[in-house]
Amino acid sequence: MPLAACSSDDEIAIATLEISKTTVDFKSEASEQSLTITTNAVAWTAQSDKSWCRPSIVGKLLKISVDQSDERLVREATVSVTADGLSKTIRVRQLGYEAAILIDQQAFEVPAVGAQIKFAVTTNVEVEPILSDWIVEAPKTRSAEMVTTDYCYSVRASILDNKRQGTIVFTEKLPEDATENDVPVSATVSVTQHGLNEYNADTGEDIKGDIKLKVKDGTASSFQGGGEIEKSFDGDYSTIYHSSWNNSGSNYFPITLTYNLEEVSDVDYLVYYPRTDGANGKFKEVEIQYSEDGSAFTPLADKDFLGSASATKVLFDAPVRAKSFRFIVKTGAGDGQGFASCAEMEFYAKNPEAFDYSTLFADETCSELKAGITEADIEKCEFPFFKNLAYYMIKGKYEPEFRVGEFKAYPNPDIQSGTHKTNPYSLLDNPTGISVKANENLIVLVGDTHGYDISLKVQNLDAPESDGFGGVTYPLSRGTNKLTISEKGLVYVMYHTRTLDDAAALPVKIHFASGTVNGYFDSQKHEGRWNELLGKATDKYFDVVGKYAHMTFETNDYRKYAANNGNELIDLYDQIALNEMQLLGLEKYDKMFRNRMYLNVMYQSYMYATSYHTAYNQTTMSDICNPSKLKTSACWGPAHEIGHCNQTRLGVMWIGMTEVTNNIMSEYIQTTIFGQGSRIQTEDMGDVYRNRYSKAWNGIIVAGSSHADFSNIGDDANDVFCKLVPFWQLELYFGKVLGRTPLQQSDKGGFYPDVYEYARNKDYTGMTDGDIQLDFVYNCCLSAKMNLLDFFEKWGFLTPINKKIEDYDTRTLTVTPDMVDALRHKVNGLGYSKPDVALEYISDNSFELYKSRASVVAG
């Protein structure tokens, strides 16, 4: 029967399970050994698959007892330890009466700088070890003949570029009367030592992480059932504390959260982890207090968390001795007044046993040795991780590219999202070129942060049937940061400012002393290195960065579709992003986005756009990762999705326009920038209509329908590409005919740049969708400096309507005769003349005629 043990802790965290040894060897006599089991589970069990091997639980120890063996050969059993769904096994071996040698660990991998290796040998014969010449015996801790003996050997530092293999062979010493037929038993320990040609970081186990202080309990002045404060210190980052969903009361804020530590402690900092599955409740303005006795509280800090999605470390100016911490949440993200939520709140004391960088390195980033350091100095270092790092450096074998970098600050993209009324651009402008594995220790050495919050995001795009965009954030502080990575992925530095221009946000030097170099390609600094960097990539995904765009696609897709022309690929995406910004008027009005447009591969849906990124199914890569196709037939998709991000709300995106006005950008990129045929001109429409122009003319102008509600032959009523026609006609006439477009104006201005600038500056508060549609007409007249009422009337913008429109959301679009009369009065009051051409008939095939002013006849 399995044995069970229970923890005395009331709170269950995410289960952990560690066993001090995974192989246990016994002599043939009945005996027992004890192993330490480390777990935070409430209960754990142990069970053996053999009756001669019996596990028993004594507190936190697992005692394994074996019966005497009368068998000839070594026998084996497996003990399974299970804790809260986690399971690990222990291999149990026992000698028989025939000669045998058992070694509990028979393979070691050591760094180039050398290391000590330890293992136990259990045998019933006298043995003699034979060593490779670069492995030497260290002082024994104990020795006992023909039972279990602990051995310790030192592996000398290597000066070789490549790995080397060595062995320690234990061979039975035969008695003097042995005959030639007696064959000695033997067992081998293999030792692999890394060479100097490729840096291999130590595991970092010797680096002492800061001490996480246990929270005993807590209280909240407001909470939603199922979202109690206990969810914010249960060790599970997927569960959250959440304030009451009813936030309508005038006294909803402030909300007070109190955390009580298990004991009074010296506390150096805390970490706030916001929820990862939404925005509601992410902290904004918070007052933090502390108390040594749990009753009298002292103000500690005022912190604006800005509703950030990143984990935030709050470092105290000096350690505080505290039993309790109180958070007075004054504002939080979310609808209405907002809410308060927290995935985890953690409190830490710095570890006094931390490595002193000044013994070997020039600064806290440990990116170069201090002047005068010798190999003898390095040999004295008692921290294997830093000893190994220093050894590579002194041998001139440490490659700093992608491991050491200066990372600049970027404005939070939410800033320009607010001023430009668009989706926010990228949060991932600082790729590192480092990839990490789940559960590995990532050692990050950080220089002066200049008082700013810096964090890492690990993004794992390998999400079958999903989109892995996002990831886990890890706050950083100056000095040594030891991070235990929860999920594999690529690493990005998150360094964002609250304002567009912040002179104090100087670059931060960061050293990734572990993790794997995957690299990335930046067209602005890696000219001519595409083949080299892509060839060296080790991860499934690879970052390609341009001046205006940044994409993360599968490495193999780059190799397959852009093997020798990745620079052209990112230049094309830069062109799309840049030219859409120019058509928005952002260059003309000195409002260019400071963040890049981000594109990532995903495995659900087809393509889509949302906050901070656009996403593309892996099945589209043969088109959008191929420069030859991207600049011809495949440009529409990315231009369309990026166009969604750039839609100016609400002035150029009222109800019904979500899949319409973004395609102003698609048409512009397809025709004006890449010189391809226009989709609405050339796309095959079957037997009834020649093209979208014909279909739109018949469905709206001839029928006298509202632009928002028209019908055509067939099942595709309210075709969004038909709705696009008048918007594109405006660019054809004012842009291609009159030259009022960014490519033809030296200031990068034009008709649409002015339209978008008006929409950015206009306050639409209190306006209905019908008001906004009519205001767009006014905007166009103002920007064109022409009276365009006839044009918009023919295209149904002035046609009365009162109908619910489904467009991701459902709202009623109302345009009344009185509203139209008011618009006419307002536009006519501008005093502009009407166009002297039949503007409603211009098309991609006919705009040249408008240049020559040939007569256009309706029909």
Model-derived segments and their meaning:
Residues 234-299, 308-362:
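Aromatic, loop-rich ligand-recognition surfaces of beta-strand-rich domains
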